Each structure stands twice: as C-alpha cells, then as structure tokens.
Amino acid sequence: MTARGLRPPQPDLFIARDEIELDRAFATARRTALDASSWVELVPAWLRGGERLLESLLEAVPWQQHYRRMFDQRFLEPRLTAQYQSLRNPLHRALLDAASALADHYGVKYDNLWLNLYRDGRDSTGWHRDRFSCRRPECIVPVLTLGAARRFLLKPRAGGSSIALEPHCGDLVVMGGRCQQDWVHCVPKDDASIGVRISLNFQSSEQARVTPDR
C-alpha cells in the first residue's frame, strides 16, 4: 500500500553526497539524564540537506502498511514502514555515511535500518520500547528525523510523567543506557495538517543479540 498522496516507489534514486552534510563532531549534542542509568541526547541540525533526502526516500523506498493484532482485534498500523536488513548495498549513499559517523561516535556498528513514514498528523506510533532490536541491558539507538517536526515522548516503563522532545528536519535523537529496558517512547497523533515525516532508526545486529560474541 502506498502513502496518501505520494508517488509510487521508483528504483535507483540517488543524490550527490555533497548535497548532504553531517556534523561528525556532534557539536550541538545535548544529553539529558533520564535516571541513573538511562539517557537521551538531542543533536540539532546533525544532518543538512534533509529535505532533499526526504524527497528521495519518499520515492525510492517500498513503503508498506501492516496489520497488527491487539486484544483479539486486527488493526491497520497508522503509519507506513520499511526495513533494510543490510546497509551493504544502501538505498542511499548518504545513509551509509550516516551509519559510519554514528558508529565512529558511539562505538556501535549500525548495519540495518528501520524507517517509519508519518504521512500527516493522523499517523502515529504508540508507547513501546525497541525490545527486539535491543536485547542487551544497555543499547544506543539513534533516530534521525526528516521532514516535519513531531513530538517525541518518553516516559518511565513503570509509570510516571513523560518528557517531550520535538526534533526538526535533520535533528538526531539518541536513546542510550537502559532506556530501552526502563523507558518507553511514542510519536502521538497531532494536527492532521502537519506535513510528512520520516524517522530513520539505525539498528545494530550486535545489540539485537542477548549477549556479546565471545
């Protein structure tokens, strides 16, 4: 199923690397301690050229919409998604550059990618943690925003008040420490007039394993 009002996927869409710039020094990074062992980091304007990359991905990615079963009922997920289980042949060379920069900075090899497409403010993601891609006690999960700004909420898994971030196009949100064990996050519904947003979740097959290789 294609996105509302979007063109169907087209293959082999690339833009020049020099149209995309990364802040490899992470100079704007601001880290917030969520508790004694969990943190979240916002890196404003980590990627420049995000709108051009957004347009490329909207056309090139084979977006799909899936059903999910909850409480014995079948629901259509309120967003489109895509997964690339390998970055060896990346959809876009800029994504390989981004994965390399993240690996150098955070010391984690990011080798696959999960993408969410929020077509407008009606699309959302409910409260969850990344339990399948983050099986170790401590993981580092970078999420890059392209397109419209949307609220990104986090709250303790055991219950409590939420904190809100609002990443804009090119901003990076990074969850670290025990965030995927002890906290949950979501992108709530908003005004329908809000534009298209893509989130790129950089994932690591190493973090998806329960214990490190010996």
Regions found by a protein language model. Name each.
Residues 1-214:
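Non-heme Fe(II) oxygenase metal-center motifs and adjacent flexible, charged/small-residue loops
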